[in-house]
């Protein structure tokens, strides 16, 4: 099952500071490289733990359909500068402050996942928060993508255990 960016929790209460707490699945963690996500990536737990602190401070972004800023359309990718993806058509709607690794039960069984914990700035994007609440209330899974890149020390190249391959590649060193 494709797990990326599945909303696990959105707090019920509007906070006076305008920040609505969220917990979102960032990606599934696999036992080995015989299983992978839709992009062919097999995230293993040890490498996920080794790199998970990069979630802290990671922006939560959205590209919107129109100026109402209610319905997300994509992630706003417009190109690349060297090995850095550029997202000029998206805005930062929140931020992740922490992470956790959790076992999450879904209709097809248990899944081990890396989750991001943070907030959406409801004071700036109230229609977007309402859209999320409505989708969750209707039982609709919200999906998105997580962009990861290589580290500065590796000139922006992601280092894969066993090298790059189409399916079952294991990211080892990344941001």
What are the roles of these predicted feature ranges?
Residues 1-175:
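Signature of dsDNA virion morphogenesis modules
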């Amino acid at each position: 099952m494709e797990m990326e960016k599945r909303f696990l929790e959105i707090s019920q209460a509007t906070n006076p500071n305008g920040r609505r707490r969220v917990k979102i699945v960032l990606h599934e963690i696999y036992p080995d490289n015989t299983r992978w996500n839709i992009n062919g990536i097999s995230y293993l737990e040890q490498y996920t733990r080794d790199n998970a602190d990069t979630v802290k401070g990671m922006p939560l972004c959205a590209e919107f359909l129109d100026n109402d800023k209610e319905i997300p359309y994509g992630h706003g990718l417009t190109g690349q500068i060297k090995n850095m993806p550029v997202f000029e058509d998206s805005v930062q709607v929140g931020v992740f402050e922490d992470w956790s690794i959790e076992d999450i039960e879904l209709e097809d069984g248990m899944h081990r996942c890396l989750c991001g914990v943070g907030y959406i700035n409801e004071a700036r994007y109230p229609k977007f928060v309402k859209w999320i609440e409505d989708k969750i209330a209707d039982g609709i899974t919200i999906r998105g993508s997580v962009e990861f890149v290589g580290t500065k020390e590796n000139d922006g190249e992601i280092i894969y255990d066993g090298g790059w391959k189409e399916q079952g590649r294991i990211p080892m060193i990344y941001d």
